[in-house]
Amino acid sequence: MEKKEIKLQMKELIKLMSEGVWEKEDMFSLTLLSSIAGESIFLLGPPGTGKSMIARRLKEVFAEKKQFEYLMSRFSTPDEIFGPVSISKLKDEDTYERRTEGYLPWANVVFLDEIWKAGPSIQNALLTAINEKIYQNGNETIKLPMKALIAASNELPKEDEGLEALWDRFILRVVSNPIANERTFYKMLKGKNKSKVVIPTELLITDEQYTQILEEVEDIDIPDNILKDITFIRKKLKETESQDEATSPLDYYISDRRWKKAVHLLQTSAFLNGRKEIDLTDLPILYHVLWNKVETIEPVMKIVTESLFWNIENKCSVVEKEYEKGLKTKGNALANSKIANINSEDFNIYFYFYTKLMGTNWGDTYFFLQDYGYLLMDIETKGVLYFDKDKNGWIIRRVPQGPFSSKKYPQHQIVSLRRAQGGIIVNNALYMMEPSKKASKPIFPPTGQQNLFSEGDTHLIEEMQKIGNELNQKMRLLEKENLFVSSTDLKVIQKYADNLGKKCEALEMKIKTSI
């Protein structure tokens, strides 16, 4: 089977399944993924958000269309799910056997609404059906044709009701929300109702193709870098579990069986995207696999996103530690010169209150002159460096301290400030204030920046540039199309990468100010 062909087939199926349904393409794609992987999926959401429609449309992608749909209640019986007992068999042959045609054991697509209302006898039979794809019908063991089990509810299973085992069997867990975008909502109101879709015969998934896919998915490689990312996720989940006092030990627990099925899901994603191995673009699918409670969705998404960039963050951390070590070991020589009082007339004044710093390699930079008197020689003061559009330049100011200083600045804008003769020390690099023609005496030293680090230390900048390139390359990979990663999930990744990029840029700027 050609990898390119399978991807085009899946892409077209997702498009057709999603026709006339708004903001649900990710649910259709993940439901298709789970069915082809032979796994189950749980849809969480209020009534009227398209959960049952997804199951009905999924049925249409298979050549053999057999669907069973049922709304559970506390009074539901096994007869209603698995079929009524055959009276004739019981009477004539003394055999307890169900007539399964038209019921769950007969269907290849099953949709069970309000799943958690099922009684213990139904739950036990479902566990076997999900785990082993078999159903014990009297003396006969039936191999189930079920390709997809889709369950739905507007709530999660309640604790201490014995539902944990059944809940663990739903590998994919997707939240179904009402339409969020108002323009999309208007399109839905104006659009024609289209309850059924027509799938061209050549796109239908036959039993033969389905079996072939399952076999070929087993050969999809799991690279070492993906295994390391998974190890990172496992460690982080355990750390979060131990640190979050508001959660129970099971809130972040992922069983070995669940991990095995999760990786099988990633292998299926890789295959259906036309690849021979799992890559980074598959990992965001774990957003919808590793959470156990609504409260853990956000932490889990954060951990999975971190797993995409942990090696880059580690490299940044190593550079930062080396930089900080250099600051400590190379001393405070720049601040030890004798400090004299300054006269504002000795310096050129800009924008009424600012003087210009010389030698900055990131652009014109202005220092709020009144802050000079608050700076100390041997103790760092927190400052802020930011770009002012009105002044078309960078501004450095002291961050006021005290009970009334409530304004907070992003971490990448924070710098350390110290006082020096005729200038200020920013992140341990001296920048002289621009002297005026009226200066009463020469300002020492006469040049702009005095370097704390030598030119031999430029390897830190080179390392940061390599890290920046690696981050850009990783984002280019992550932005490649994956049929089962939504634009919403991709935005989460992009936002995280942007923040990481700013953090790296801030560190690089700190280093540059010291070289």
Report residues per predicted region:
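Conserved C-terminal "switch" segment of AAA+ ATPases
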Residues: 3-7, 20-21, 159, 174-247, ...
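Pre-Walker A (pre-P-loop) alpha-helix and adjacent loop at the N terminus of AAA/AAA+ ATPase modules
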Residues: 4-46
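Conserved alpha-helical scaffold flanking the Walker A/P-loop in AAA+ ATPase domains
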Residues: 30-34, 87-110
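Walker A/P-loop
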Residues: 32-74
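Conserved NTP-binding/hydrolysis module of P-loop NTPases
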Residues: 74-94
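Canonical AAA+ ATPase core
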Residues: 88-93, 109-122, 128-205, 214
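C-terminal helical "lid" subdomain and adjoining coupling/linker elements of P-loop NTPases
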Residues: 219-221, 236-311
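Terminal-proximal interaction/regulatory segments of ATP-powered molecular machines
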Residues: 298-515
